[in-house]
Amino acid sequence: MKIETQSTRSLKILSIDFDYFQNVDADTIRSCYPDGIDLPTELSTIVWSGYYANERTRNKLSSVTILNDELNLLRKLLKSKDNFRVSTPVLITNSHVHIYDFIHKYMDEYDATDVNIVNIDMHHDFFNKNKELDCGNWLSHIYNDYPNHCNVSWIANPVSNICYDFDQTLNNLVKNSIQSIKDFKFDILFLCRSDNWLAPHLDCHFNDLIKLISLRFPNVCIEKSVQKPRDINCIVNNIRNAYLTQSQL
């Protein structure tokens, strides 16, 4: 572990993708989740609605619940003055891609030389088939921007290994619970909803977390599209009504 000196300054980041907090099996992810890169909320909501309107996939999605024990550990961490200052800068968005500029902004403001990231996430976000910066490869871009000065730990969902096959490099990064970072101190906080990877019926839990963060930290910026839960029921009803109308013609 690198020791900070007058010539080194490490920016410590807690990155939270709320898709981590899903209690979900691999089959449901593979058959019921929209996938896609950085879909806007409006588009991913329409895609999700198709799965909720279909009885077979709706039944699978209804089995997706929240990892309450892990979420409670996160709440405890966020409330602790030992882990976060009240003045901690916070950014809350839909896509994880926005963390890239957020990190660069505070690397400059803190005059930091090193970056230490704990990523709580269902996905590793190191690489995909896209060379351009996106929600699924932002970590590799940060790593390339700060070669030999970037340290990453990944708290992975229990289903992550089943879905995405850890190689040895990824396996070395993995921590199995938020409990493992209970003594960490962080400089900045990032949270994303990842609309194409979070089952919308769990949005209420995300919004409860936003409320906690907003009360705890005054320096918080929240993207408009994630300030309220997605209205899946309205679109599902429209799909069903359109189908009934079509069948009666």
Regions found by a protein language model. Give the residues of each.
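Conserved alpha-helical scaffold segments that buttress catalytic/binding sites
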Residues: 2-249
